[in-house]
Amino acid sequence: MQVSVETTSNIERRMTIGVPAQEIDQAVQKRLQETARTVRLNGFRPGKVPMSVVKRRFGDSIRQEVVGEAMRDNYIKALQEQDINPAGWPKLEPKTMEEGKDLEFVATFEVLPEIELGDLSKINVEKPVSEVADKDIDNMIDNLRRQQATMKEVKRKSKNKDIVTIDFKGSIDGEEFEGGSAEGHRLTLGSGQMIPGFEKGIVGGKAGEELEIDVTFPEDYHNEDLAGKDAKFAITIHKVEEPQLPELDQEFFKRFGIEAEDEVAFREEVKKNMERELKQAVSNKVKNDVVDGLLETTELEVPAALVDQEIDRLRQDAVQRFGGQVDFQQLPKEIFEEQAKRRVKTGLLFQEVVKKNDLKADEAKVEEKIQEIASTYEQPDEVVAHFNSNPDQKAQVESSVLEDAVVDFVLGAAKVKEKKMKYEEAVQAGQPQR
């Protein structure tokens, strides 16, 4: 086997491989003989078909099969000989494949980029500093109660947090516009679901009343045809309902999987959950800043093959989240391209930090993270046992711990600035980037 490698770009290689004609022709002949023993053709007894007939009928297709297998096998051997690590599968193109001639083919493929990490000291990280205050717990419990609320129709004037059932019809300069009308729409007043001024204009209205309100679409409204324009809405209120909040009793606590004797114990459990959420949010915010910093300080060309693989994973995840009712390949690749590129770049950069600094997943931290995950379940011991008896599951935790080690390493060199935030602000800042 003869091999030559040409560098066509930073991450693309063109490999020309030659395979002796004797090797290909022998494989073709062997396949023809096997076919002659098993093929059934009209006018011939099984196993008695002349080789000339078999070759005339099946020779071309058999040679194509043999050449395809030879290209795959010799490509893999060539990679090992040349000590090349490809990113994704190659494009294989035969140049010569005639009988009696050496097989020559070209494999075009991408390789993982050589990465020169940027100056980590130029990375800026903003770390939220926050705590769970009593007011935050009050708000959380109020939200939990509203999730479990039953609705009661009332005849009074509507107010914030009521749910109104309305018909509305919008117009601009006297002309109705697409998407500006609905019937039987249920709206929680004060939720911010509608454009500014819409919900406020309904507050104080009663069932059976007809209202007319003037609003202005925000300048950054997603529909450019409506952005910044004044509109008029004619609204009919059909029903006003107020939420009936459940009592804070043991039955209510159990709906959230919490065994608590009284409200004090329930608040303590809610606080623990909120503190866990806050801790994760801070970790996410710091990690997002680290990733942003690595991407900004390091030039990196990513192999298209890896991006395509990640796009397919994202499309499959999206299909699963929405019930698996469609083939993931029906989802446009463009929707996921930027997200896929970020993920691939992040993975390559993290791998480089690990390799250059010989970072490891600390076993004690792996066990600590497993215990932390298990503590959120009713049977934590069973969850721990599950992780310890399932190598793939444990490997995911080890990967997460190794990512944390990368973040910690970068933080040691980066400029870290702490910023005081309220609980809700910190949680919002720590929303993970997909």
From Swiss-Prot:
Its EC number is 5.2.1.8. One of its GO terms (biological process) is 'de novo' cotranslational protein folding. InterPro entries: PPIase_dom_sf, PPIase_FKBP_dom, Trig_fac, Trigger_fac_C, Trigger_fac_C_sf, Trigger_fac_ribosome-bd_bac, Trigger_fac_ribosome-bd_sf, Trigger_fact/SurA_dom_sf. SUPFAM superfamilies: FKBP-like, Triger factor/SurA peptide-binding domain-like, Trigger factor ribosome-binding domain. It is found in: Cytoplasm. PROSITE patterns: FKBP_PPIASE. Residues 161-246 form the PPIase FKBP-type domain. Keywords: Cell cycle, Cell division, Chaperone, Cytoplasm, Isomerase, Rotamase. It comes from the Bacteria. GO terms for molecular function: peptidyl-prolyl cis-trans isomerase activity; protein folding chaperone; ribosome binding. It catalyses: [protein]-peptidylproline (omega=180) = [protein]-peptidylproline (omega=0). Its main location: cytoplasm. One of its GO terms (cellular component) is cytoplasm. It holds the Pfam family Trigger_N. The keyword Transmembrane does not apply. Involved in protein export. Acts as a chaperone by maintaining the newly synthesized protein in an open conformation. Functions as a peptidyl-prolyl cis-trans isomerase. Belongs to the FKBP-type PPIase family. Tig subfamily. Consists of 3 domains; the N-terminus binds the ribosome, the middle domain has PPIase activity, while the C-terminus has intrinsic chaperone activity on its own. This is Trigger factor. It comes from Marinobacter nauticus (strain ATCC 700491 / DSM 11845 / VT8) (Marinobacter aquaeolei).
